[in-house]
Design a protein with these regions (language model features):
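Transmembrane beta-strands of outer-membrane beta-barrel pores
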Residues: 55-61, 88, 105-111, 151-157, ...
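Residues that define the transmembrane beta-barrel architecture of outer-membrane proteins
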Residues: 47, 76-84, 120-130, 167-173, ...
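Short loop/turn motifs that connect adjacent beta-strands in outer-membrane beta-barrel proteins
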Residues: 41-48, 90-100, 138-145, 183-189, ...
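Outer membrane beta-barrel transmembrane domains
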Residues: 203-303
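Transmembrane beta-strands of outer-membrane beta-barrel proteins
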Residues: 49-53, 97-103, 145-151, 173, ...
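Residues on the lipid-exposed face of transmembrane beta-strands in outer-membrane beta-barrel proteins
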Residues: 53, 84-88, 131-136, 149-151, ...
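Outer-membrane beta-barrel biogenesis signature
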Residues: 25-50
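Detector for outer-membrane/organellar transmembrane beta-barrel domains
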Residues: 146-148, 157-244, 278
C-alpha cells in the first residue's frame, strides 16, 4: 500500500536505464504496512465489535539500492493513509480461542517524485481491501496469543507505470501468528511479538509475480497509570523468495527494512477509546525507500 515496486518501464516514458532501475527499487512487494500495530501488536480485545482507525504519515528522501547503499536518486516520497478497520470478536470458541473476523479498508494518498527529473506522480484512492474471515485469540493469566488468515483483494487502482498507484494489482494471502507476555500480575509490563507471512499472486498487468514477504512487529510497554502506557515498538520485513516473470527487475534481490521508535497509549474514558501515537525511523533498508513514519490510531468499542 505505502510502497510497491514497479515492473519494467517502457521506453515510451522517455527514461534512461539507470532511472528505470531507481524507480523499480522505489517500490516493494507487500500489501501489509510495517509497524502499524505497536507495543501490543499480538493482543486482541475480548468479544465485541470494535472500530480501529489508523492514520499513517510516511516520508522518505532516501532510496536504498540492491546492495543497501544510498541510491543517487533524489527521492521525495510522501504517503498519507487513513485506514478503517472493523473487528468483530464473537462469543464463539474454537480450539479454546475466541473466534473473530475483521475487514480493513484503506484510503491512500501518495506523492512520488524524483527531483531533477520529469518523474512526478500523485494519486489518491481506495487501496487494496483486507478480509480476514478467521481470527483466533487466546487470553491466559499472563499472556495473550493470536493467529489469523486473510486475503488482500485487488480493489485499489493499479497502473504498473505509476508508482503512486493505491493498489498492487494482486491477490495476497496473509498468515498471522503472535503473542504477548506480561511480566507481572497487574499486567503493567509487557513484551509482544507478531509475525506475518504474505504469499502474492500474479499482477493483473504485465508478467510479474512478487516474492513472498515475512514481517514482524515487536514492542515493550510499561503501563504508568490508568491513562498512560509508554514503550518502544519496532518492526522488520524481508522478502523471502525471488520475483518471477518477464517484468521482474533484479528478481534475485530480496528487499528488506527495519524500523524502531517510541509509542504512547492514551486511554480516553470520556469517549471509551484508546489512542496510540507512534513514531518510527527506518534503517537497514535494501532495494526500497527508507524513511520515517508517524502513526496515530484510535480504537473504540461499538458494542
Amino acid at each position: 500500500m505505502i510502497k510497491h515496486r514497479m515492473g519494467r518501464i517502457f521506453s515510451s516514458l522517455c527514461l534512461g536505464a539507470s532511472l528505470l532501475a531507481m524507480m523499480s527499487t522505489a517500490h516493494a512487494d507487500g500489501n501489509y504496512v510495517n509497524g502499524v500495530e505497536g507495543i501490543k501488536a499480538a493482543s486482541l480485545p475480548p468479544p465485541g465489535v470494535y472500530w480501529r482507525w489508523y492514520n499513517l504519515f510516511y516520508k522518505s528522501t532516501t532510496l536504498k539500492d540492491t546492495s543497501g547503499n544510498k541510491s543517487a536518486a533524489d527521492l521525495n516520497l510522501d504517503v498519507f493513509a487513513s485506514v478503517n478497520r472493523l473487528i468483530w470478536i464473537t462469543d464463539k470458541k474454537f480450539l479454546g480461542a475466541d473466534y473473530g473476523m475483521d475487514l480493513i479498508i484503506p484510503l491512500v494518498n501518495t506523492n512520488f517524485k524524483i527531483n531533477n527529473t520529469t518523474t512526478d506522480f500523485s494519486t489518491f484512492g481506495v487501496g487494496d481491501v483486507l478480509v480476514e474471515p478467521v481470527v483466533l485469540s487466546w487470553h491466559g493469566q499472563n499472556w495473550d496469543a493470536a493467529t489469523a488468515l486473510g486475503v488482500y483483494l485487488p480493489t485499489g487502482d493499479y497502473n504498473r507505470f505509476d508508482p503512486s498507484s493505491p493498489g498492487l494489482g494482486q491477490y495476497t494471502m496473509m498468515y498471522t501468528l503472535g503473542g504477548t507476555w506480561y511480566f507481572d500480575k497487574e499486567k503493567t509490563l509487557s513484551a509482544s511479538l507478531l509475525s506475518r507471512y504474505e504469499i502474492h499472486g500474479d499482477r493483473n498487468e504485465g508478467d510479474l509475480n512478487k516474492g513472498d514477504d515475512f514481517h514482524f512487529e515487536a514492542g515493550i510497554g510499561k503501563k504508568i497509570n490508568d491513562i498512560f502506557e509508554v514503550g518502544i515498538a519496532g518492526y522488520g520485513q524481508w522478502q523471502m523468495t525471488d520475483d518471477s516473470g518477464r517484468d521482474a527487475v533484479n528478481p534475485t534481490v530480496h528487499d528488506r527494512v527495519f524500523g524502531i521508535g517510541p509509542e504512547v497509549l492514551i486511554t480516553v474514558p470520556a469517549i471509551k477509546s484508546v489512542v496510540s501515537i507512534r513514531g518510527t525511523s527506518e534503517f537497514g533498508g535494501r532495494d526500497r525507500p527508507e524513511g520515517n513514519m508517524l502513526t496515530i490510531t484510535l480504537t473504540k468499542p461499538l458494542q
